[in-house]
Amino acid sequence: MSQDLVWSIIKKNNAFLKSSHGLTLSAEPGNLRNKNSLKYSGLARRTTIDVAAVNGKVVVSSKIVKKAAFPAQSKKTTTFSTVNTRKTARFVKTLATQYAPELRAAALGRLHRVQSALRSAKKAAARKAKKN
């Protein structure tokens, strides 16, 4: 199926849509900006990049275009620790540039937000551990 046909089917009706105050946002995996549009859709596009936090680590995943007919096999994931943030940023920048150049800025922005959220979660946990 073409991505335009899939988008025309799911754009107004899917389980990930969130509407509030006239805005329609999307919470689907692979949607880097959470906008309900074809450019950022993780369901309709053939090429998607997803950056998420799982168990205190950064997980970067992308779709394998050749395996699109097999959804269970169509994701490639790479896990990074929070220690080396520049290495992770370089990986995401290279992946996005080669794979989906129009998503490079969005992928790096999502990576920055995920890494800062993980850092603040660690600091909050460390403060709670102190007792007098």
UniProtKB/Swiss-Prot annotation:
The keyword Ribonucleoprotein applies. The keyword Ribosomal protein applies. GO terms for cellular component: cytosolic large ribosomal subunit; extracellular matrix. Disulfide bonds: none annotated. GO terms for molecular function: structural constituent of ribosome. Keywords: Ribonucleoprotein, Ribosomal protein. GO terms for biological process: translation. Belongs to the eukaryotic ribosomal protein eL28 family. PANTHER family: 60S RIBOSOMAL PROTEIN L28 (PTHR10544). This is Large ribosomal subunit protein eL28. It comes from Dictyostelium discoideum. The lineage of its organism: Eukaryota, Amoebozoa, Evosea, Eumycetozoa, Dictyostelia.
